[in-house]
């Protein structure tokens, strides 16, 4: 089970990503636009670098909603493989059951 501080850190990152998403998108559009002048592009790059590091979506880590486990995460369910198996065995996941052939 992940430390509660790790879960809190990920929640904080998610808030920052949501807060700065529009600003980051606008700056990236200015930077990637070929008609933008070099001065405007450089200003946009500096502003983008000035944003908080954790406001980048690439720094987020998918974690299990129950345990906070970062590995073996299944995006469709929001759970780690271990917790998904336990929930499946209890019959809590509709349409999912143990394979037998």
Swiss-Prot record:
InterPro entries: Ribosomal_uS14 (IPR001209), Ribosomal_uS14_bac/plastid (IPR023036), Ribosomal_uS14_CS (IPR018271). Disulfide bonds: none annotated. GO terms for biological process: translation. GO terms for molecular function: rRNA binding; structural constituent of ribosome. Keywords: Ribonucleoprotein, Ribosomal protein, RNA-binding, rRNA-binding. Transmembrane segments: none annotated. GO terms for cellular component: cytoplasm; small ribosomal subunit. It comes from the Bacteria. Belongs to the universal ribosomal protein uS14 family. Part of the 30S ribosomal subunit. Contacts proteins S3 and S10. Binds 16S rRNA, required for the assembly of 30S particles and may also be responsible for determining the conformation of the 16S rRNA at the A site. This is Small ribosomal subunit protein uS14. It comes from Shewanella loihica (strain ATCC BAA-1088 / PV-4). The gene is rpsN.
């Amino acid at each position: 089970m992940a430390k509660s501080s790790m879960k809190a850190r990920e929640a904080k990152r998610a808030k920052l990503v949501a807060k700065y998403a529009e600003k980051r998108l606008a700056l990236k559009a200015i930077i990637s636009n070929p008609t933008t002048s070099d001065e405007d592009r450089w200003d946009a790059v500096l502003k983008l670098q000035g944003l908080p590091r954790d406001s980048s979506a690439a720094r987020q880590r998918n974690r299990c909603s129950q345990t906070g486990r970062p590995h073996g995460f299944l995006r469709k369910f929001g759970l780690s493989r271990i917790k998904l198996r336990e929930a499946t065995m209890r019959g809590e996941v509709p349409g999912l059951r143990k394979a037998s052939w």
